[in-house]
């Protein structure tokens, strides 16, 4: 018999799945359960009914996993904030959870053989700083009473919160949330930034326009041996250790040498392009491609005077298809958005004939799909590292090295 929304059922929880869920089954129906752990027996409340599957929240734990802990945040509960998926999971178990998701996607979507995945040694590494107080950029939604808060899972409903424990301490101290008495009339969201150089910015967002109410519209970040100027609303990694960790990993995998030519695709403010330029030197060449106006502006401010760096303002797909970037290339960095690079970009990159590609990914599924396309072009995934850039959440960052087979 089928179950309905808001109905409660007892479930034995199975393996982890993408999205911060575990898989369970009830009367032949697949149920994706939040706030649960593999092997647990839980009472789950059905939250969504779809053709072919259901969604549910574990509202009571009957038999707990040894990896279960008490969430440090009072809002990381069923029906409340949807930001942190894994606060009920011990930190070491969170790393295993994410590695299991990565492995499953490589099997299912990349279609890599099990021995090949075993050889990669798939694991997720913790970054310095612990699991709380790491998020240097937080965007709060604003409710109908003008209070800033966070969204429920898969909902536009705002949960007014007194504090966000994963936010950087400098952000936690800001009088932004409802506990401080702050109200934000006419604002759709409040954006906060705490940079690595100690700068703090608060902006309101309405109708697609950001208005700075505290600090400056640009902040400075220090990473990869450089000082970067970045618009407050432009993309920059949210974990304080992320930029250095990713840059070091990309350089180690690619091993650039003086005189080589490199492409930095989806280059943003220029983090990887700057690091590559330092390695290939004045006799080398680095071409950065970025479509976001703020990213292009930042890249030109940061790297405009760096010898051998060319900045192309265009969508990566367009730049490749219309041959706005041409000539021999030795190395490529791909750092696409969550949707991945896509088949057309992968085919164009492999056709250009580089000796190696470093792929930086924030979504294991998109990464795995692109790895499959690389394989169809005669390339292989030669190395893979995973990093926990987003503790307490389902998200994981990957850096893969792809080379001609």
Model feature map: region roles:
Residues 312-396, 403:
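S-adenosylmethionine
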Residues 1-334, 339-347, 353:
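Accessory RNA-recognition modules of RNA-modification enzymes
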Residues 145, 403-405:
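Short loop segments at secondary-structure junctions
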